[in-house]
């Protein structure tokens, strides 16, 4: 299979359905309503053709004609600028800076923990990391409750960071109970019901999470 970048007339996303970074980008593409070809990549069997596109052999990788991008944050910000409607970043520079800092902190503080879990979900280290992640998110219950979405009344790239993380935790059986749990479950219900989220997972998400045990 030849996957030369400059011969592709339709945008292509090289993705792994189980990779949360790829999931971020799929949500953005769905929000923007951008037609694209989805190429599922097995991280254990990387082809030479793919290595020609991305020498780091990581996913997600986006090909837009002769442009090849990797790193989910770079891809998402490119898509938001390339397709400005609906906007997924604030207009004002100060607010954009705050959004970027929030995404950086989510990646450093929370994604680092889920990465430990994904390596070996049954290990002692993974269970400890998952418990820590749950507790840290519950501690921000008031932040989840304060606005319609995370620190904003508009759906944004920050939510595209948080949604795949919460989806992964949901699939691992994590229950958000106790203080902060109600707000997080309300947020999950709202985000998981968005059309873009359903498209990003290739099917329907749970309709309502508020019936879970408090």
UniProtKB/Swiss-Prot annotation:
Domain GST C-terminal: 92-209
Start and end residues of each GST N-terminal domain: 9-87
Cellular component GO terms held in the UniProt record: cytoplasm
Protein purpose: Forms an equimolar complex with the RNA polymerase holoenzyme (RNAP) but not with the core enzyme.
Family (UniProt): Belongs to the GST superfamily. HSP26 family.
Protein name per UniProt: Stringent starvation protein A homolog
Annotated organism of origin: Haemophilus ducreyi (strain 35000HP / ATCC 700724)
Encoding gene, per UniProt annotation: sspA
